[in-house]
From Swiss-Prot:
GO biological process: cellular response to ionizing radiation; DNA damage response; DNA repair; double-strand break repair via homologous recombination; interstrand cross-link repair; meiotic cell cycle; positive regulation of double-strand break repair via homologous recombination; positive regulation of reciprocal meiotic recombination
Consequence when changing residue 346 to A: Decreased interacting with RAD51 and ability to stimulate RAD51-mediated homologous recombination. Does not affect interaction with DMC1
Chain positions with Phosphothreonine modification: 66
Compositionally biased intervals (Basic residues): 1-10
The record's account of how the chain is modified after translation: Sumoylation with SUMO2/3 by NSMCE2/MMS21 promotes stabilization, possibly by preventing ubiquitination. Sumoylation is required for alternative lengthening of telomeres (ALT) pathway.
DNA damage recorded as keyword: yes
Biased amino acid composition, Acidic residues: 188-221
Primary role: Structure-specific DNA-binding protein involved in DNA repair by promoting RAD51-mediated homologous recombination. Acts by stimulating D-Loop formation by RAD51: specifically enhances joint molecule formation through its structure-specific DNA interaction and its interaction with RAD51. Binds single-stranded DNA (ssDNA), double-stranded DNA (dsDNA) and secondary DNA structures, such as D-loop structures: has a strong preference for branched-DNA structures that are obligatory intermediates during joint molecule formation.
Main localization (coarse): nucleus
Protein name: RAD51-associated protein 1
Covalent link Glycyl lysine isopeptide (Lys-Gly) (interchain with G-Cter in SUMO), residues: 269
Residues where Phosphoserine is found: 19, 21, 120, 124, 280, 327
Tissue specificity note: Highly expressed in testis and thymus. Lower levels in colon and small intestine. Little or no expression in spleen, prostate, ovary and peripheral blood leukocytes.
């Protein structure tokens, strides 16, 4: 690479008059390229300083000449001179504008909401009136629901199910009456001497049901009959309770006799056949034979023999025989200790 040749300006030292002093280097004339710093300062001092009051007076007529624009309510103009000085004020003003817009929107929405509420109230009144007319036409049933029945359409549901509910109540009442009559008839067959027979028969069910649903007088008669039925039931319970207790006692004694007497099965069979027949009789007759036979049954009970001696009694005549038992500690190897001496399993194989 060849370097380019530098252009050098020759210096004429003849201008400096060949003097050795340092003042020779200072030129009397200022070069044209450089600007003097002292000249602009002098020019600035020559100009008069404008007063602030004069500037304000000049700005005011200019603003008055320009026509003012009418702004919407709640907004105001910001002068151009105040913008750079107040930056935080702009954010606050924007926030206030947003609030005003929101308030204006809410004011506009309020009348629409009120109109909607009025329309809904009118509709609900119309629905309520129509539902009342339907209920009066179909049945005089009134719904038990106190919660906003107009909005939930509860009146319609109750109106549709009125007929089924009344029929179900009638059926339930008739079934209950029929069951009570059956129970009374069964009790009167067993204890005819002590108890009185009921005044009404099962063939009168339909008549009683119709009377029960038609008028209040028949309802009072039905309540009187119910009270009579309850009194008859109490009497039956009192009569049946001692009989049931006697039967339970006789059955428990029969079971004790069957379990205790093992040596005479034939006698047990004859007693078990005769006992059910006697149970149906009065309680006095059932107690006497049981009391007579109880000592004989106690005498025939076998004495208790311990289970360990049962095996020896069969082989020998003596009831108690001592059986010799060897302790298993000799042949058993407990643990895995190497020092324990163990007998060989096959002594013949080791000897050979």
């Amino acid at each position: 690479m060849v370097r380019p040749v530098r252009h050098k300006k020759p210096v004429n030292y003849s201008q400096f008059d060949h003097s050795d002093s340092d003042d020779d280097f200072v030129s009397a004339t200022v070069p044209l390229n450089k600007k003097s710093r002292t000249a602009p300062k002098e020019l600035k001092q020559d100009k008069p300083k404008p007063n602030l009051n004069n500037l304000r007076k000049e700005e005011i007529p200019v603003q008055e000449k320009t026509p003012k624009k009418r702004l919407p309510e709640g907004t105001f103009s910001i002068p151009a001179s105040a913008v750079p000085c107040t930056k935080m004020a702009l954010d606050d003003k924007l926030y206030q504008r947003d609030l005003e817009v929101a308030l204006a929107l809410s004011v506009k929405e309020l009348p629409t909401v009120t109109t909607n509420v009025q329309n809904s109230q009118d509709k609900s009144i119309e629905k309520h009136g129509s539902s009342k007319i339907e209920t009066m036409n179909k049945s005089p049933h009134i719904s038990n629901c106190s919660v906003a029945s107009d909005y939930l359409d509860l009146d319609k549901i109750t109106v549709e199910d009125d007929v089924g509910g009344v029929q179900g109540k009638r059926k339930a009442a008739s079934k209950a009456a029929a069951q009570q009559r059956k129970i009374l008839l069964e009790g009167s067959d067993g204890d005819s001497a002590n108890d009185t027979e009921p005044d009404f028969a099962p063939g009168e069910d339909s008549e009683d049901d119709s009377d029960f649903c038609e008028s209040e007088d028949n309802d009072e008669d039905f309540s009187m009959r119910k009270s009579k039925v309850k009194e008859i039931k109490k009497k039956e319970v009192k009569v049946k309770s001692p009989v049931e207790k006697k039967e339970k006692k006789s059955k428990s004694k029969c079971n004790a006799l069957v379990t205790s007497v093992d040596s005479a099965p034939a006698a047990v069979k004859s007693e078990s056949q005769s006992l059910p027949k006697k149970v149906s009789l009065s309680s006095d007759t059932t107690r006497k034979p049981l009391e007579i036979r109880s000592p004989s049954a106690e005498s025939k009970k076998p004495k208790w023999v311990p289970p360990a001696a049962s095996g020896g009694s069969r082989s020998s005549s003596s009831p108690l025989v001592v059986v010799s038992v060897k302790s298993p500690n000799q042949s058993l190897r407990l643990g895995l200790s190497r020092l324990a001496r163990v007998k060989p399993l096959h002594p013949n194989a080791t000897s050979t």
